[in-house]
Amino acid sequence: MATELDKIFLILAIAEFIISMLGNVFIGLVNCSEGIKNQKVFSSDFILTSLAISTIGQLLVILFDSFLVGLASHLYTTYRLGKPVIMLWHMTNHLTTWLATCLSVFYFFKIAHFPHSLFLWLRWRMNGMIAMLLILSLFLLIFDSSVLEIFIDISLNIIDKSSLTLYLDESKTLYDKLSILKTLLSLTSFIPFSLSLTSVLFLYLSLVRHTRNLKLSSLGSRDSSTEAHRRAMKMVMSFLFLFIVHFFSLQVANWIFFMLWNNKYIKFVMLALNAFPSCHSFILILGNSKLRQTAVRLL
């Protein structure tokens, strides 16, 4: 039977789901209708639409996950149900994170201005580079899934035996293996974060350089390019902030679940973990002029 704490958690989880679904469905519908009307799909719209679809899939998994944890948390520790849910959540989370990273890289090359030949060469081949990043993310997904499967097997094995007395050497060996696997998973998560961080740093350098050039030419410090720089920086920095919250919440959730799996407060760590897919869509809407204007007209 659900406790009062479970009911509060489920109400918050459902509210988080509905709000985020509205944002992502809106992004998908606007971009699809624009693509049909113009008979052309721009790279930014394609990435945004793919990100919205991926996030919708992740939100559905999160909702099922929330009901499972809130109403029948004991089923989460079974191989038949717990393992597929964790694997599916990881896949959708991986795709969402990498698509958001590709969007950050796209904004950087689309908006920033550097005279360096390497930057110009990469900018000219931007679509191909985004495709290469997506291919890299698929290879990393295969690697991560293999590591995660071993991680889950060991973790559920520990939970299954938690009521028994494990030999000290056996217990130490299992936890050592978990530490190594968690490190590998954290390292692969660091790749999209570092790419987005690099994008926002170079966007800032480009903005400083552009503003200095405007002042030297007596044109002031505000023009369309400056505003584009600032909007892109706000979106990428917001993504980085949400990604940091998401990443550390994931580490805390792993620790609580696999070390103290029946702790009642893991539910609220999950709400913080889901802040990234829940809030990111509205940041994208506010930062994209087409989406923002459409939203204003609807309101």
Swiss-Prot record:
The keyword Transmembrane applies. The keyword Transmembrane applies. The chain crosses the membrane at residues 8-28, 51-71, 102-122, 128-148, 188-208, 239-259, 266-286. InterPro entries: GPCR_Rhodpsn_7TM, TAS2R. Pfam families: TAS2R (PF05296). It is found in: Membrane. Residues 29-50, 123-127, 209-238, 287-299 are cytoplasmic. Residues 1-7, 72-101, 149-187, 260-265 are extracellular. Its main location: membrane. It comes from the Eukaryota. GO terms for molecular function: bitter taste receptor activity; G protein-coupled receptor activity. It is a multi-pass membrane protein. Most taste cells may be activated by a limited number of bitter compounds; individual taste cells can discriminate among bitter stimuli. Belongs to the G-protein coupled receptor T2R family. Receptor that may play a role in the perception of bitterness and is gustducin-linked. May play a role in sensing the chemical composition of the gastrointestinal content. The activity of this receptor may stimulate alpha gustducin, mediate PLC-beta-2 activation and lead to the gating of TRPM5. This is Taste receptor type 2 member 42. The gene is TAS2R42.
